[in-house]
Amino acid sequence: MKMSNMLVGTLREVPAEAEIESHKLMLRAGLMRKMAAGIYNYMPLGLKVIENVKNIVREEMNNAGAQEFLASALIPAELWQESGRWDAYGAEMFRLKDRHNRDFCLGPTHEEVFTDIVRNEIKSYKQLPLNLYQIQTKYRDERRPRFGVMRSREFIMKDGYSFDKDQEGLDLAYEKMRKAYVNIFNRCGLDAKAVAADSGAIGGSGSAEFMVKSEVGEDDVVFCTACDYAANIEKAPSTPEHGEKEELMEVEKVETPAVKSIEDLAKFFECSPKKIAKTLIFQADDKVVAVVLRGDREANEVKIANAIGEVIELEMASEEAVKEATGAAVGFAGPMGIKVDMLLVDQEVANMYNFIIGANETDMHLKNVNYGRDFEGIVGDFRNVTIGEKCPECGKEITISRGTEVGHIFKLGTKYSESMGATFIDEDGKAKPFIMGCYGIGVTRTVASIIEQHNDENGIIWPLEVAPYHVSVIPANVKNEEQATKAEEIYNELRKMGVEALLDDRKERAGVKFKDSELMGIPMRITVGKMIGEGQVEFKLRNGGEVETLSIEEVYNRVREEFERANLSL
């Protein structure tokens, strides 16, 4: 491609809307342009990167025995109603009606569609196992789109589904997909780690996320400092601290005027927050749920939702709902006598002695409260783990880092096949539901994550296999006929070799061309300058190193070396 013919628009200034490096650089390098909040148009340069990532995904999925097809993005409501998710998915789903007033949605995910196809096409165990995937545009009406394509309302995703006759088959399919995902992210140049995860709205049992460490990641990821254990904080089990055993004391009501926060309570009672139990009140669809935690702990809404059961939306209760449940102003809720549909008590609170709670009376608290004697509820793990707690596998300390999810694999089991009546005839002639797995990769999010891990102050540094172009050929002075002619000859020879080459034949200063090449992240640069009269050119790698002066034949070999180093063939 010649840059004089290319739709490219690099930007020197950072767009005000961009908060993170990938968003800034995707706009500055001309990979995409914003059309609306969370909606982007991909320019030629960006589309080439996306297609390169797609091709890596295709190769690894095909090598693992999966078959590609393409489902419709427009899905009739009936399929989602069969699975029970039409109402359960919530406000993120884009819903619409056709001219006959029939309900449809723009697919945020495709479990129902794949299940419908397979139940109509596969009748016997002899046709199993089966693994299908597609690379499709998805739509989710995010409450707050941000960070460019990291959280957008329209995005490209690879979603795949396996269908097996038994659990052993699913386990095998799951492991094949796990290995394929490791290969995909390695080839994309991403340092991604599989971590234990919650299944969320997808449902099912076993689940792992592929996480990329990132300071701007939206997830907290728990890592063990000694072993390979890793989990999303939503999934990671907490280790309860056991309070020192004390003699149970009589409950005492204490006036605490305008003392609401844990910090203020600790000062008022001259105690540690560990001696206080806070009561948080949630609205879970039509249920009001109270959760009791130690004062210094954070609630884990995923664990809470899982304990409640089928929950469409979990949010903090309104001030009115709190007053109705407690009979008091906000800040004085407690588990004794509270009027809620469900009372969840973190396991740590059940092991505390003589602690302080809200009295369900404005400006009043109770002290010397003990679980079991004074109140009871459903005991479980309802909080986030914290740095320094014990690893559930080896007992050593854990640490917590921010991360971005780029892939997710699930063992769905029969969740969708049973609800949608998707069955096959087994060896004994009996109808059985398909055992399913689900495997997703965010293609556009992967592109952004690559940029997050591969950039410097000058721009993007693409790994060779995903780069839009492998080599940028730059005549230092296009007005110099010899430089322009030789640059085009080198460009044409590289293309014959199978190299994706970009010839910057624009009538711009060499410095401008160098800056654009670095901003766009082209892995190799060949500069045809004054030394061309001696048969020499300059070669430079984008990811560092000195400028090398080489003959034209040597520069071709140098390009080949970089392909070999990246395990790529020409």
Curated annotation (Swiss-Prot):
One of its GO terms (molecular function) is aminoacyl-tRNA deacylase activity. Its EC number is 6.1.1.15. It comes from the Bacteria. HAMAP family: Pro_tRNA_synth_type1. PROSITE patterns: AA_TRNA_LIGASE_II (PS50862). GO terms for cellular component: cytosol. Consists of three domains: the N-terminal catalytic domain, the editing domain and the C-terminal anticodon-binding domain. GO terms for biological process: prolyl-tRNA aminoacylation. Belongs to the class-II aminoacyl-tRNA synthetase family. ProS type 1 subfamily. Catalyzes the attachment of proline to tRNA(Pro) in a two-step reaction: proline is first activated by ATP to form Pro-AMP and then transferred to the acceptor end of tRNA(Pro). As ProRS can inadvertently accommodate and process non-cognate amino acids such as alanine and cysteine, to avoid such errors it has two additional distinct editing activities against alanine. One activity is designated as 'pretransfer' editing and involves the tRNA(Pro)-independent hydrolysis of activated Ala-AMP. It comes from Clostridium perfringens (strain 13 / Type A). Keywords: Aminoacyl-tRNA synthetase, ATP-binding, Cytoplasm, Ligase, Nucleotide-binding, Protein biosynthesis. Homodimer. It is found in: Cytoplasm. It catalyses: tRNA(Pro) + L-proline + ATP = L-prolyl-tRNA(Pro) + AMP + diphosphate. The keyword Cytoplasm applies. NCBIfam families: PRK09194.1, proS_fam_II. This is Proline--tRNA ligase. PANTHER family: MITOCHONDRIAL RIBOSOME PROTEIN L39/PROLYL-TRNA LIGASE FAMILY MEMBER, PROLINE--TRNA LIGASE. The gene is proS.
